[in-house]
Amino acid sequence: MSSQCRSAALRLLKTRPRSVGEVEAKLKDKEFASGDIAEAVEYLKEMCYLDDRAFTVGWIRYRLARPFGFQRIIRELKEKGVAEGIIADAVAAAREEHPEETTAKALAQRKAERLSGIDPLKRKKRVLDFLLRRGFPMDAAYKAIKNI
């Protein structure tokens, strides 16, 4: 049964990188024994197929390219079962390279241009809501819509 669990875990990793928590949850959903799951996860870690630090850095890079704010990225990583310490380290490094206010301003400008035919107050509200859904903090979102 352990080899079936290991095979299922490898199939999960074929589609996209995953966190340890995601792999464990998916294998539990497939009703594998917890001992088999632990064995499979340990094997994948030894083979360097599972690494939460690398997954976190990659996920942050992927989501910043979309662009999303750090609040949403952090929430997504927690949902994926990544440890808070790993998230905090990776986010701290990424914040230095990608200031949220700059990203929020550029994104707000692009969104406002698409909403050019709308009443200015409604446009600001829609852009603000958009930025907040994207995970930008309230203060960065307000600064971004100030000159729209």
What is the role of each PLM region?
Residues 1-148:
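An alpha-helical, amphipathic repeat domain used for nucleic-acid recognition
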